Swiss-Prot record:
InterPro entries: GlcNAc_MurG (IPR006009), Glyco_trans_28_C (IPR007235), GlycoTrans_28_N (IPR004276)
Topology of the protein relative to the lipid bilayer: Peripheral membrane protein
Organism: Carboxydothermus hydrogenoformans (strain ATCC BAA-161 / DSM 6008 / Z-2901)
Residue numbers binding UDP-N-acetyl-alpha-D-glucosamine: 10-12, 124, 165, 197, 251, 296
Protein name (record): UDP-N-acetylglucosamine--N-acetylmuramyl-(pentapeptide) pyrophosphoryl-undecaprenol N-acetylglucosamine transferase
EC annotation from Swiss-Prot or TrEMBL: 2.4.1.227
Record's subcellular location: Cell membrane
EC category: transferase
GO cellular component: plasma membrane
Molecular functions (GO terms): UDP-N-acetyl-D-glucosamine:N-acetylmuramoyl-L-alanyl-D-glutamyl-meso-2,6-diaminopimelyl-D-alanyl-D-alanine-diphosphoundecaprenol 4-beta-N-acetylglucosaminlytransferase activity; undecaprenyldiphospho-muramoylpentapeptide beta-N-acetylglucosaminyltransferase activity
Length: 371
């Protein structure tokens, strides 16, 4: 069998695809897996590390507000569709799986026209425009949140939860060994701050407010992912940081970092929250305020209601509010332990099994024809 995974641009779309692909490869080692992405997406550096071939499509995100930039990028859509048809006709995959992102739409759409079995996964409670269009055409729609059913017109909707790479679960179960490997002492706290694959200005501002306090606490370690665009400026601004404060552009080995943390400060994208839950890490969640339908705040509230996180709105991140929210958590290890336990209960742990089962069911008719 040959499988094509289309998804990327950001980690939120790419990592669920990688989780499914890894799981499939474990149970079907002889099957061929290809990824389709975009020239500027995070997949260019991440996918090769997992050993999967990557095909690039010339397509970019289209801004929701009408402008000359919107029209310019719309001209790329027909080209990307043509390239998607050419690619699929050449590779002849048995199934196409889309997890959102710029490359997902043209590849999945072309696959539906070519009558190739198709599955899409929608990460958020408020589906994106591309997946709303595709939902009526594909063979199966997998959803993280059941309430997304109200916003999608499709025959075969499945509430599967969000797939997470197995390393998160494995490393969470071996947390003490992971902390030793990172050099985190028994009496030390590890704070991890990140804002997605591109970073987040607000997260960086929040960490800046906390740095003087971190300097005064020798038992507090920090891994701070600034985002590639902000790294050089912040590196110049905060010179001579102690060794226990590690500033990096991006955490590309997140399964080896996040499960070791005592507290995370991050946005509230669905994929990030699934990884936090799999890692059993409490969090301070600062939802991206411009997400469609404010879906990140909705995601965050699910964690808050389970006692696994604290919510800070972007507009509320003044220095006083940040310190009043986060410092008491760092002073309450017992509370962090309880929040960590609650975080581990939020996530469905059978997502990969259910999604791969749906894929296998779609492929059965093809298997029968070949035998």
């Amino acid at each position: 069998m040959k499988l094509v995974f289309a998804g990327g641009g950001t980690g939120g779309h790419l990592y669920p695809a990688l989780a499914i692909a890894q799981s499939w490869k474990e149970s079907h080692p002889n099957d061929e897996i290809l990824f389709v992405g975009t020239p500027r997406g995070i997949e260019n550096t991440v996918v090769p590390k997992y050993g999967f071939p990557l095909y690039l499509l010339p397509v970019e995100g289209i801004p929701r507000k009408v402008s000359w930039e919107t029209l310019k990028k719309l001209f790329l859509v027909p080209k990307s569709l043509i390239n998607a048809f050419i690619f699929l006709k050449k590779e002849k995959p048995d199934i196409v799986v889309g997890t959102g992102g710029y490359a997902s739409f043209p590849v999945v759409f072309a696959a539906t026209v070519l009558k190739i079995p198709t599955v899409i996964h929608e990460q958020n409670a408020y589906p994106g425009i591309a997946n709303k269009i595709l939902a009526a055409r594909v063979d199966a729609v997998c959803l993280t949140f059941g309430e997304a059913k109200k916003r999608m017109k499709a025959k075969n909707l499945y509430e599967t939860g969000l797939p997470v790479r197995r390393e998160f679960f494995t490393n969470a179960a071996n947390r003490n060994e992971l902390r030793k490997k990172m050099g985190v002492g028994k009496d030390e706290l590890l704070l991890v701050a990140f804002g997605g694959s591109q970073g987040a200005l607000t997260i960086n501002k929040v960490v800046g407010y906390l740095l003087p306090e971190i300097m005064l606490r020798p038992n507090l370690r920090l891994v701070w992912a600034t985002g590639p665009r902000n790294y050089e400026n912040l590196k110049q601004k905060y010179k001579n940081l102690p060794e226990r404060v590690q500033m990096v552009p991006y955490i590309d080995n997140m399964p080896e970092v996040l499960p070791a943390a005592d507290l995370a400060i991050t946005r509230a994208g669905a994929a990030t929250l699934a990884e936090i839950a799999a890692s059993k890490v409490p969090a301070v969640l600062i939802p991206y305020p411009y997400a469609a339908e404010n879906h990140q705040e909705h995601n965050a509230r699910a964690f808050v209601s389970h006692g696994a996180a604290v919510l800070l709105r972007d507009a509320e991140c003044s220095e006083d509010r940040v310190k009043a929210t986060i410092l008491p958590l760092l002073d309450s290890p017992e509370k962090l332990v309880k929040m960590a336990e609650n975080a581990g209960k939020v996530l469905r742990r059978d997502s990969l099994k259910e999604i791969t089962g749906i894929m296998e069911a779609l492929l059965k008719p093809k298997s029968n024809k070949k035998t």
